[in-house]
């Protein structure tokens, strides 16, 4: 593969085929392409607009080069991040609830643009985010939950870290996280930072051997199920791609004030989650339940979203014990107790 020819093709706004994109991504991730060319390629892709084939090719390369573990029937709640609203880390809270009934392989990283990525909030709760593969399998067996820290499970990505940091713009790698779970999770609730990317990412997901993925983008521009209004969804399954629009009131609840969901730090996010689990923060609890409801539908545990919401009400009642179990087997209970004390007021 001639990298300069690939670059010329991208500059001319021609899309790469899947195989071309996969080969290119492998060369970049392995550190075989000079940084100046890597930056040129990433910018050219962004300016052209990443195609479905390019996303699929890059995702396949990242999956192949990842440290892998096997977690049958797992669900992930990883989204793209990057909506910039700074809301409580609801995907992590939902993952904890889901682990009461199904294996969860939560793929994630530190915050991109928000105040609290999955890794940040789990650390604040006392969780040890560096989990080697054998230990990960053991934790799933014992607790139904494991966090797969992206930087640990995709070690070759260090070869592009400097370029990405120097560029300081969104690149194709920012949207690959939820498509590259190291446990090859077959089910997913995937928040998407932009409504415009729903179609592109759903078509990409369809090519990547998922059983069922629900991609969501909610009003007012949030990469979660909307707490205030409409959520735009793409439901991807073996049968194809279905487009759905759903309003928060369709759960049978009122809209949730967005300002009640904003956090200032990872610790703040952890406290809000624990308060919701304890029944002390109704707004955050509702936000967790509506997102969990859609994830339950992705797992085919319920027949519709409203039934999922009713199921989530039951799950959140058992969430504190589950969180204690998860941290006690892989973390620092002292940290969790500190958060519990701060949450009890």
From Swiss-Prot:
Is Isomerase found in the keyword set?
no
Cofactors demanded by this protein? Mg(2+)
Keywords, comma-separated and alphabetical: Amino-acid biosynthesis, Aromatic amino acid biosynthesis, Glycosyltransferase, Magnesium, Metal-binding, Transferase, Tryptophan biosynthesis
Q: Which domain of life is it from?
A: Archaea
Residues that bind 5-phospho-alpha-D-ribose 1-diphosphate, according to the entry?
79, 82-83, 87, 89-92, 106-114, 118
Q: How is the cofactor bound?
A: Binds 2 magnesium ions per monomer.
User: Gene3D superfamilies in the record, alphabetically?
Assistant: Nucleoside phosphorylase/phosphoribosyltransferase catalytic domain, Transferase, Pyrimidine Nucleoside Phosphorylase, Chain C
Residues annotated as binding anthranilate 1: 79, 109
Q: Please state the pathway this protein functions in, per its UniProt record.
A: Amino-acid biosynthesis; L-tryptophan biosynthesis; L-tryptophan from chorismate: step 2/5
Q: NCBIfam families per the record?
A: trpD
**What do we know about how this protein assembles, alone or with others?**
Homodimer.
- Biological role stated in the UniProt entry: Catalyzes the transfer of the phosphoribosyl group of 5-phosphorylribose-1-pyrophosphate (PRPP) to anthranilate to yield N-(5'-phosphoribosyl)-anthranilate (PRA).
Name-wise, this protein is: Anthranilate phosphoribosyltransferase
Supply the source organism for this entry: Saccharolobus islandicus (strain M.16.27) (Sulfolobus islandicus)
